[in-house]
From Swiss-Prot:
Disulfide bonds: none annotated. This is Methylthioribose kinase. Belongs to the methylthioribose kinase family. Homodimer. Catalyzes the phosphorylation of methylthioribose into methylthioribose-1-phosphate. One of its GO terms (molecular function) is S-methyl-5-thioribose kinase activity. Keywords: Amino-acid biosynthesis, ATP-binding, Kinase, Methionine biosynthesis, Nucleotide-binding, Transferase. It catalyses: 5-(methylsulfanyl)-D-ribose + ATP = 5-(methylsulfanyl)-alpha-D-ribose 1-phosphate + ADP + H(+). It comes from the Bacteria. GO terms for biological process: L-methionine salvage from methylthioadenosine. Substrate binds at residues 229, 344. Coiled coil: none annotated.
Length: 399
């Protein structure tokens, strides 16, 4: 790791000239640092015409918003690149194309998606991409099926579980999803007016037991190679296109975690809409988010079952009916994990633009209250929400 150095813009340009795959490398002349996350530098590389041509991303050895007191492994750059390369084998149409990565410098070069929009940014503005949820469901079906026991040879699967072991970033997930929102913690960031509600989460024994079960399955169930951080801020959308990026939290874990994270993000948008948009537009946006929830699950479920029927390699798992049984288990997990996503994004430190963008303080409090209440309900009732219709009915009942 002695070769590691933090890139400046000029370093990113020079690196892109070497590994960006452009026809005329010397045409790359400028870089703009555009990263808005806490873990990485992200440079957009421009040519002489001012056109963005390629992305150079470098992992930082610490969390940006905290500093050197929160160090992080640089191996996550390798993990992210290899997860995306692996996912790209099975779903290239919805996975960002990795052009090159260097584990010693913790640098990845990838395709530029400047012709796409970040899905979350458009959701906040009330812009709808009706195809996106179905495309995301397809991505999840393809990547999670093909890296599961249904398809992988058991020897390869066991080797890949080791190859993609990601303890440091999993530790962050475990803290932010399953521990800190249910404790008095300095990193929690909910509105002061909701202290009684936050306290009720800490004191709800039934809820804490359910969260413990979700955390235990996150620890123990190496079902498929997860993206590990599926949310609308790590998804780019354009007409007819969806691309998933930012897989540094990837590891072998429970399939329902990726599905639930995606569903939970759509539900955050659902809860936030009244604070971001005029009443009529907000009501319309909420209906569209419920349709997205339906489309995402149906696309995933139909895709997974079709792949299982056609491509299962394990003789026992290929027995007719087993894939449906397994899918029912994924469904229960997905509902529960969607609840933890809602709570960690509103009680915990990982606040998102959907909530932060609400200008009216009282409205923000009410939107956060609704998200927390819905999250709690989904965690507690995950085993009793029979299907997608029941889930949508439960969401409507929450308000």
């Amino acid at each position: 790791m002695s070769q590691y150095r933090t890139f400046a813009a000029a370093d990113a340009v020079e690196y892109a000239r070497q590994f960006g795959g452009v026809d005329n490398p010397n045409s790359l002349v400028d870089a703009l640092e555009v990263g808005d996350g806490n873990l990485n530098l992200v440079f957009r590389i421009f040519d002489t015409a001012g056109v963005s041509r390629v992305i150079v991303k470098q992992a930082l050895p610490w969390v940006r918003c905290v500093g050197e007191s929160w160090p992080l492994t640089l191996d996550r750059a390798r993990l992210e690149a290899e997860v995306l390369i692996e996912h790209g084998k099975f779903c290239p149409q919805h996975t960002v194309n990795i052009l090159h990565y260097d584990p010693l410098l913790a640098v990845t070069v990838m395709e530029d998606l400047s012709d796409h929009a970040i899905w979350r940014a458009d959701l906040v503005k009330g812009i709808d991409w009706p195809q996106a949820a179905g495309q995301l469901g397809d991505y999840l079906a393809q990547t999670l099926f093909h890296t599961s026991d249904f398809f992988q040879h058991p020897h390869q699967k066991k080797a890949d579980v080791i190859r993609f072991t990601n303890p440091e970033l999993c530790d962050i997930t475990e803290e932010l999803f399953f521990n800190e929102p249910y404790e008095v913690h300095a990193r929690n960031a909910y509105p002061r007016a909701l202290e009684p509600l936050a306290e009720s989460l800490r004191e709800d024994h039934e809820l804490r037991v359910a969260v413990a079960g979700l955390k235990h399955r996150f620890y123990s169930n190496a079902e498929a190679l997860l993206h590990g951080d599926v949310h609308s801020g790590s998804i780019f959308v354009a007409e007819g296109s969806l691309k998933v990026i930012d897989a540094e939290f990837g590891f072998y874990g429970p399939i329902g975690f990726d599905i639930g994270s995606a569903l939970g993000n759509l539900l955050i948008s659902y809860c936030a809409a009244p604070g971001l948009l005029p009443p009529r537009e907000a009501a319309d946006a909420r209906e569209k988010r419920l349709n997205d929830v339906r489309q995402l699950w149906q696309s995933f479920a139909e895709g997974f079952l079709a792949l299982a029927a056609e491509k299962s390699r394990d003789r026992a798992l290929a027995v007719p009916g087993y894939a449906s049984t397994f899918l029912a288990k994924i469904w229960r997990d997905s509902v529960g994990y969607s609840g933890t996503e809602l709570i960690r994004r509103t009680v915990g430190m990982s606040q998102v633009a959907d909530i932060k963008g609400i200008q009216d303080d009282a409205m923000r409090v009410e939107c956060v209250r609704q998200a927390i209440t819905l999250g709690r309900s989904l965690i507690l009732l995950a085993d009793h929400v029979a299907d997608i219709d029941a889930l949508i009915a439960r969401i409507r009942q929450n308000g």
